[in-house]
């Protein structure tokens, strides 16, 4: 890997998705390399992010920078959420009753029993309100296709996995605690977080966001849902997690590029 870096040169910064895999660690710890890690995913277990081995860690927000707790951390924002916040949803429902296409985003449910448990209250709502139910699996999850087929074998649902959330046609969402909540919030589409744990990343939001800790609570929140009631909560959520979609990554990378050229010029470039 050191030979690879030497061939590529040092006049350009190395932008990494992580500095905790073998090859990325080798690059990040090279004394001549200027590198930056782009935050990828929520800062839950900090062992996946700390210590910061790269020159810099580009965090999504002030909150993420605080969680990383390193002098190398920069509040940089992210392209993804900045882009999503500029999109306008085709649907804008005020209540759950108005929803025509409801998306369930799975993250922690993996076995057929877990998936069936998660779907049960939604199927009850579907029977009562007549909406179309869509299910999206986390693209990086270890879902078994057989387990999923078993869970939905008798249900009228649409299945998604690799598709980007913004390409799916839906107007309401139920989300098992994951980064997907940010995607949906950026799109301006109402959602309810489903979180039956007590120590998840989203625990701090249980008094703010509509959060279902049980099937019974999910049913109640859905029936009583009002977008006007929760819109301030969604906006506060975006402010805390991604600084309302502000993105400085471009300018920061240009700055790193200038630093590299000033420091190394052509000395290490082929």
Predicted features and spans:
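Donor nucleotide-activated moiety binding/catalytic core segment of transferases
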Residues: 139-187, 191
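Catalytic binding pocket for nucleotide-activated donors in carbohydrate/polymer assembly enzymes
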Residues: 69-71, 75, 152-153, 179-243
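Leloir-type glycosyltransferase catalytic cores
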Residues: 108-117, 208-270
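Structural motif
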Residues: 13-22, 39-40, 56, 59-62, 101, 105-110, 171-174, ...
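Conserved catalytic-core segment of nucleotide-activated headgroup transferases in glycan assembly
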Residues: 75-150
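Active-site and donor-binding regions of nucleotide-sugar-utilizing enzymes
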Residues: 1-81
């Amino acid at each position: 890997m050191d030979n690879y870096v030497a061939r590529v040169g040092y006049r350009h910064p190395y932008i990494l998705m992580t500095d905790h895999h073998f090859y990325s660690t080798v690059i990040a710890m090279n004394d001549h390399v200027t590198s930056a890690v782009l935050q990828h995913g929520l800062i839950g277990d900090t062992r996946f992010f700390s210590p910061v081995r790269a020159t810099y860690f580009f965090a999504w927000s002030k909150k993420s920078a605080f969680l990383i707790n390193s002098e190398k951390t920069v509040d940089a924002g992210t392209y993804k959420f900045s882009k999503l916040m500029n999109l306008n949803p085709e649907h804008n429902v005020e209540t759950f009753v108005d929803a025509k296409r409801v998306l369930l985003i799975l993250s922690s449910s993996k076995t057929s029993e877990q998936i069936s448990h998660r779907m049960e209250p939604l199927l009850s709502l579907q029977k009562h309100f007549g909406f179309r139910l869509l299910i999206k699996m986390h693209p990086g999850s270890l879902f078994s296709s057989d387990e999923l087929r078993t869970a939905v074998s008798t249900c009228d649902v649409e299945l998604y996995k690799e598709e980007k959330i913004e390409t799916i046609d839906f107007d309401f969402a139920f989300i098992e605690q994951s980064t997907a909540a940010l995607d949906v919030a950026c799109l301006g589409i109402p959602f309810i977080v489903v979180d039956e744990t007590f120590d998840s990343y989203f625990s701090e939001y249980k008094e703010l966001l509509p959060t279902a800790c049980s099937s019974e609570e999910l049913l109640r929140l859905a029936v009583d849902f009002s977008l006007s009631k929760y819109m301030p909560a969604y906006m506060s959520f975006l402010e805390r997690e991604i600084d309302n979609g502000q993105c400085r990554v471009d300018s920061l990378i240009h700055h790193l590029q200038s630093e590299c050229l000033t420091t190394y010029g052509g000395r290490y470039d082929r």
